Amino acid sequence: MPTAGIHTVTVPGAVAGWEALRHRFGTLPVADLLTPAIHYAEEGFPVTEIVAQGWSNASERLSESPAAAKTYLIEGHPPRTGEIFRNPGLASSLRRIAASGRDGFYRGETAQAILRLSNELGGTMADADLEQFEPEWISPIHTTYRGWTVQEIPPNSTGIAALLMLNIMEQFPIREWGFHSAKALHVMIEAKKLAFADLLRYVGDPKFSAIPVETLLSKDHAARRAQGIDPKRAAARVRPSHLEGYTNSSG
């Protein structure tokens, strides 16, 4: 599985998800819901420091695509902290959704633009992939963290990693150390490394592979993983845990 390029692109599901949520739980028309987003896409917003850093890290790759450079770079450079970023193309796409609902995205001008670019880059997406897309209603996974229940989206999303991180962090006296103390930050960073090592090792599409969700979210598993954190040294390389009977589902 490549890490970049057209073959990493799946059928976009957000718009269908918004529509399903609105029909089930909402009362406002989609045009009202999208008005603020359209405003910020068209008029712009100041870029925050962390977003500017992420943009800077991706600037070389964005520069390789004329369309991406035109959309996401400002006069050839990534948006800097405090600069106003505008995305009029996104505003136009959102207006079509506001006017026609999901058909304003999965059919018509936006859909054809998606398919045209996919074809140009050697992708395999077809009209039917967009027109027939349906979101899935799923049951969340959860853990507890110091008495609080925390829910996340189940695999094949990465939500399980956040829950595993919390379980590992629960093994340490974070509050006693102070939330922004060096000790606490060290444990948070190392817990993230451990959680993502297990994520990449065991989590894939549940339609095609068995995923040990209960085991990964057990407190015993977190306690064992926490033992791998050196309190005085950052791990240069983190190995996934070994769970008997499971193989690498992510490829």
Language-model segments: which ranges?
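Noncatalytic scaffold domains of N-terminal-nucleophile
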Residues: 1-107, 111-157, 174, 217, ...
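Internal maturation/activation junctions in enzymes
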Residues: 76, 172-251
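Flexible, polar/acidic helix-loop-strand segments at domain edges
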Residues: 160
